């Protein structure tokens, strides 16, 4: 992953260094407020909108070490689409809490927050409803399986309904292992999930999920 870490105080830089040590297999760049002049850190420019915008469009994850409000203000002008926005995480300077702010599922912010929190001995603050209710998260599942979501509006409706009741799923391909919590096999109902490539709408509101297939021709 390409990860950028931003710190705004001496203690924040100490925590940022700890975070960087936890990510040896990732490409991590660190930046600090200009007044700090920390070794190994780039400088956050005073006119920072374009600076954060470039990282937002390029990075897989942005980690802010400081007040949560800083992260929100800096990313706000650049938020576009949950399918493409990077994971954004905030960590307080004492590393007590690790908070995914943006792209918790598709961008992987929740998983990264759990990973960092476990290594730092911090508390992960997860607020996505499917996670705190231990329910199936269709967008997270699709990313992990390498699938594409056909319609994000339908995905939101599935996520909302699954908090209330189980959702039927039907697939043109075998589903390995046990079904996630909140899913049942079925081919009828008001709302459900279809996995495959056919133009099928087995449910009144069908969320189509497309597996990726690589075709080679000689």
Go through each PLM region and give its residues:
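Extreme N-terminal starter segment of soluble prokaryotic enzymes
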Residues: 1-5
């Amino acid at each position: 992953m390409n990860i950028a870490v931003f710190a705004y105080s001496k203690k924040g830089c100490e925590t940022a260094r700890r975070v960087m040590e936890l990510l040896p297999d990732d490409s991590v760049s660190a930046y600090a407020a200009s007044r700090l002049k920390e070794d190994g850190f780039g400088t956050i420019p005073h006119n920072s909108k374009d600076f954060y915008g470039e990282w937002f469009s390029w990075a897989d994850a942005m980690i802010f070490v400081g007040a949560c409000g800083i992260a929100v203000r800096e990313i706000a002008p650049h938020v576009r689409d949950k399918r493409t926005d990077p994971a954004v995480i905030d960590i307080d300077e004492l590393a007590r809490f690790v908070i995914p702010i943006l792209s918790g599922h598709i961008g992987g912010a929740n998983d990264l927050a759990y990973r960092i929190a476990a290594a730092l001995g911090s508390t992960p603050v997860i607020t996505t409803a499917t996670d705190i209710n231990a329910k199936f998260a269709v967008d997270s599942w699709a990313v992990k399986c390498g699938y594409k979501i056909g319609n994000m509006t339908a995905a939101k409706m599935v996520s909302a309904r699954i908090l209330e009741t189980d959702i039927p799923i039907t697939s043109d391909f075998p589903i390995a292992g046990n079904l996630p919590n909140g899913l049942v096999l079925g081919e009828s109902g008001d709302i459900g999930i279809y996995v495959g490539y056919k133009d099928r709408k087995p449910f009144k509101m069908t969320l189509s999920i497309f597996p990726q297939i690589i075709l080679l021709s000689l």
